[in-house]
């Protein structure tokens, strides 16, 4: 599956569902205000959440539906065979696959359960980060506030795990390194303060290391 370095990719929050009328499939590209985990190693976690207003200014003028993010186009917004709209739950996708033979074949694969996973490619124009410690685990949560452009939604044969995909790793690696550096600095400062406190106690008790 080819990934373009200037885009981010995520598995769809919920798989596509074939509709009984026509060759139409529907599903949610993402859900709003529902954090999901991108990375965890027991000591550090990276979470992400999409703000419900993230798509308000998104360029969705020519979004296409593909297979594995490459090759033939099965549906697209420009010819009204692909539509996307935000509702209370998330970004809803509706794709009419009846226009071409390969589209109808993909519909049959989705209907038969042979292909049931999807992912989408996008760019982020604005986000915010929040760091906190929960039960001894350092967590950094990214809130996506503004998605700049949505490029494609794709049926995928073997979906990349969000925690190991290239686009997610490029995001989380830097966050984990920062969290580790901040933890080391806190531990260094805490150790220094403990040594200072111990020295003050010895001085207050009239003793020094030379006693």
Can you say where each PLM-predicted feature lies in the sequence?
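Signature of dsDNA virion morphogenesis modules
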Residues: 1-180
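Terminal short linear interaction segments
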Residues: 178-211
